[in-house]
From Swiss-Prot:
InterPro entries linked: DNA_mismatch_repair_CS, DNA_mismatch_repair_MutL, DNA_mismatch_S5_2-like, HATPase_C_sf, MutL/Mlh/PMS, MutL/Mlh/Pms-like, MutL_C, MutL_C_dimsub
Gene Ontology process terms (BP): mismatch repair
Keyword Protease: no
Pfam families: DNA_mis_repair, HATPase_c_3, MutL_C
Any one GO CC term of the record: mismatch repair complex
Entry keyword DNA damage: yes
Gene giving rise to this polypeptide: mutL
Protein known as: DNA mismatch repair protein MutL
Keyword tags: DNA damage, DNA repair
Signal peptide: none
Family statement: Belongs to the DNA mismatch repair MutL/HexB family.
């Protein structure tokens, strides 16, 4: 068969296969056109998941009759002033959207430019163009797309259900609305109530308002502002506190020069920044906006314009990591649990008990048969730690359980009679008052109370100490007089012996001790006396999971996290008041103490006003 030039209609349909993948692609292209036209309000309506109808109305600059006739021609655009594709400052620039849509659907455009006495309309029916005719419309443009893929019915069988396609459309609109909080958006149709996002004020407050409207109140209340700039690149936006996570990366919204993108480089940078805060199966929620000179980024990578290529990718990645780490460190003690709203809701009874009849209050609680006995004073004697003693893991390695006298056999709450020093009440985490279930420390602050998970808090402290020691002078180690002989599966032994250098950097010296056994000769002094067998099994399991894919630095941090978990005070360990206060003070001095190495919160803070609401005092 000889080579021949394809007809224009076939060319447009081929191009439509790249540009118009599904109804959401049509909405994306048309909304981007509205944004480029300077619209301050954009209304979107869809029906049948966008297959039956899509209508986009904006109040932008509109088009003249001549521009309208040219707009549906292939590669016709008003967005490039010259031949330089390295100066792209608009969302659209290829001039393919309208002719591609018109080649596979019934396209109708009505538009009015401010210089025109009336509006103009044009229709394209599967590639067949009609003449431009007068019409009625205020300034702006209305684009309607009906019977999508009418000319290529084979494409219809690849579409999902109407509900799924409608949700994909809403996700496209959400991303564009995040990028432009100064524009009002309304999306309606699909037999659902319309959703409107009003135009927000410029700047970070307006940006956070728009993000909160779209991502929800949880994100707004836990959002951390991040910002960093170097040379011609700037990164800003908001990142959720580590306690607010998702099971996938769909909550990560990335924008480059106002363009929503999906970039593996940026996603990898986000993951690296959160590595110290989240387990591998959880993902952060962020909205990051990268701004740089258009000449430093190539947006002409894919027809859908969802991918970009950076000239200096290393700088962009470093800035994102720096911005996120700085913001997370600044809010290091902040967790989702700091807001006592969810906790108060959990405490609140499901029903209101009947109000008792008013009468004389002559009940004596001290003589009630159900009243607990008075607390018995404690005498810690020589076992007590000084109040200012450093809180070290070694002090908690298999200690004798602190003595405690319980007022009643069924009591779960142990009260210490030592009053808190006034200055401790002014500390961020207050003064320790008691311990619940040998697991949670209850501390009093000047305006409320704090409940601390002692294991999670201590785990973060030990982890940060291990990291600091590794980066400074190396982890101090203790030589065991009698080596611990640990019997393990041969596969586990091989995995551990293959990483002896990594383990040695943390003060854990092991060597082979025959088939299926290792000898532990040195352990990190920070961890005190540890269960060597349990630690080695967990390390081997995690090493098998990491493999060689992770960089050495990340593997070392995983080793540190595993060691910290094993070297921390356990739940169920009774603590003395001095020990509890020492732990609180260490938390206040430790970076990122708001969550443990697995992303769980280390403490909950309740304001006195919240507690008073529980009892109807407010």
């Amino acid at each position: 068969m000889p080579v021949r030039q394809l007809p224009e209609q076939i060319i447009n349909r081929i191009a439509a296969g790249e540009v118009v993948e599904r109804p959401a692609s049509v909405v994306k292209e048309l909304v981007e056109n509205a944004i480029d036209a300077g619209a301050s309000r954009i209304d979107i309506f869809t029906d049948g998941g966008g297959r039956r109808k899509i209508a986009i109305t904006d109040d932008g600059g509109g088009m003249t009759a001549a521009d309208l006739a040219l707009a549906v021609e292939r590669h016709a655009t008003s967005k490039l002033d010259d031949e330089d594709l390295l100066q792209i400052r608009t969302l659209g620039f290829r001039g393919e959207a309208l002719p591609s849509i018109g080649s596979v659907a019934r396209l109708s455009i009505t538009t009015r430019h401010k210089s025109e006495p009336h509006a103009w309309a044009l229709q394209v029916d599967c590639g067949e163009k009609s003449p431009v005719v007068p019409a009625a419309l205020n300034q702006g443009t209305r684009v309607e797309v009906a019977d999508l893929f009418h000319a290529t019915p084979a494409r219809l069988k690849f579409l999902k259900t109407d509900r799924t396609e409608a949700e994909a459309i809403r996700e496209v609109v959400r991303r564009l609305a995040m990028a432009r909080p100064d524009i009002a958006f309304t999306i309606a149709g699909e037999e659902r109530a319309p959703v409107t996002w009003a135009a927000a004020l410029p700047g970070a407050p307006g940006q956070l308002t728009r993000l909160g409207d779209i991502l929800g109140a949880d994100f707004r209340s836990h959002a951390i502002a991040v910002q960093s700039a170097r040379e011609s690149v700037a990164v800003e936006g908001f990142a959720a506190a580590p306690a607010l996570t998702r099971a996938n990366a769909l909550g990560q919204y990335l924008f480059v020069n106002g363009r929503p993108v999906r970039d593996k480089l940026i996603l990898g940078a986000v993951r690296a920044a959160y590595a110290d805060y989240l387990p591998r199966d959880r993902h952060p929620v962020v909205a990051l906006f990268v701004t740089l000179d258009p000449r430093e980024v190539d947006a002409n990578v894919h027809p859908a314009k969802t991918e970009v290529r950076f000239r200096n990718a290393g700088l962009v990645r470093a800035l994102i990591i720096h911005a996120l780490k700085e913001g997370l460190a600044r809010e290091g003690r902040r967790t989702a649990a700091n807001d006592g709203g969810a906790t108060i809701a959990a405490f609140r009874p499901a029903f209101a008990p009947p109000r008792p009849n008013p009468g004389p209050m002559n009940w004596d609680w001290q003589r009630s048969p159900s009243a607990p006995a008075a607390p018995v004073p404690r005498d810690h004697g020589a076992d007590a730690m000084p109040a200012a003693a450093a809180f070290s893991p070694a002090a908690f390695a298999e200690p004798a359980q602190a003595a405690f006298d319980v007022g009643g056999p069924r009591a779960d709450l142990r009260l210490h009679e030592q009053p808190a020093a006034p200055d401790l009440l002014d500390r961020p985490l207050g003064a320790a008052r008691t311990q619940l279930h040998d697991t949670y420390i209850v501390a009093q602050t000047r305006d409320g109370l704090v409940i601390v998970d002692q294991h999670a808090a201590h785990e973060r402290i030990v982890y940060e100490r291990l990291k600091a020691s590794l980066s400074a002078h190396g982890v101090q180690r203790q030589i065991l007089l009698i080596p611990d002989i640990v019997e393990l599966d041969e596969a586990i032994v091989e995995a551990l012996l293959a990483r002896t250098d990594e383990l040695a950097s943390f003060g854990l010296a092991i060597e082979s001790f025959g088939p299926g056994a290792v000898a532990v000769r040195e352990t990190p002094s920070l961890l005190g006396k540890i269960n060597a067998a349990g630690l080695l099994r967990d390390l081997a399991e995690h090493m098998e999971e990491w493999g060689e894919a992770l960089p050495l630095e990340r593997r070392l941090m995983h080793v540190a996290a595993t060691m910290a978990c094993h070297g921390s005070v356990r739940a169920g360990r009774r603590l003395k008041p001095e020990e509890m206060n020492a732990l609180l003070r260490e938390m206040e001095e430790t970076p990122n103490s708001g969550q443990c190495n697995h992303g769980r919160p280390t403490y909950v803070e309740l304001k006195l006003a919240d507690v008073e609401k529980l009892f109807g005092r407010r």
